[in-house]
């Protein structure tokens, strides 16, 4: 998304002699689908996979073990913190997209990916295979909002980079749960990096 992205990549490749490939949201979804995620989900149910980053968030719908659709939106933790003027428009687009593509899908649940949801899950002391409920996520969100930036660092032990972005990240997951009518969110220890390794091994990318 960076305006100087191509220039930056060229400079890195020149200095390191390492080729860099920039992937879009659609390809990212396919790479994630190639992970062992399929072993963790129930083939009879439907899931909305949400990967929250700093500048964008990827949404992928799975149902009965198949990838139905995927879309990347330019809204992430950093963009929300910066109060980007386009945020309101993008929020509406996300709500519409999720509502349309999860309509009619029963037994819906979220699958969360990203450093912030991993931290939230760790703080919950929940067992690895168990999900977090919408009620818990909402209560945790309200709890975080009441604390100052300094309190989130000193009392919760969050690092400085995490202490500010964890609130907008939680808002994204909560909104996705609400719009998809999901009552729980799973947080597996599988993500894009796992998919890249597996895809490279099998010659997919």
Language-model segments: which ranges?
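A short acidic Gly-Thr/Ser loop motif
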Residues: 50-56, 113-116
């Amino acid at each position: 998304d960076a305006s100087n992205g191509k220039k930056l990549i060229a400079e890195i490749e020149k200095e390191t002699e390492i080729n860099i490939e920039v992937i879009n949201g659609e390809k990212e979804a396919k790479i994630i689908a190639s992970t062992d995620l399929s072993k963790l989900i129930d083939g009879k149910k439907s899931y909305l996979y949400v990967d929250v980053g700093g500048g964008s968030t990827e949404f992928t719908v799975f149902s009965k073990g198949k990838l139905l659709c995927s879309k990347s939106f330019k809204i992430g933790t950093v963009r929300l913190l910066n109060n980007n003027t386009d945020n309101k428009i993008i929020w509406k687009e996300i709500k519409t997209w999720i509502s349309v593509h999860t309509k009619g899908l029963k037994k819906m649940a979220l699958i969360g990916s990203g450093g912030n949801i991993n931290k939230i899950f760790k703080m919950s002391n929940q067992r690895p295979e168990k999900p977090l409920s919408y009620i818990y996520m909402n209560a945790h969100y309200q709890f975080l909002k009441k604390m100052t930036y300094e309190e989130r660092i000193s009392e919760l032990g969050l690092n400085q980079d995490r202490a500010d972005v964890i609130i907008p990240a939680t808002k994204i997951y909560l909104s996705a749960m609400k719009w998809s009518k999901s009552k729980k969110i799973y947080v597996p220890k599988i993500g894009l990096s796992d998919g890249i390794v597996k895809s490279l091994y099998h010659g997919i990318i």
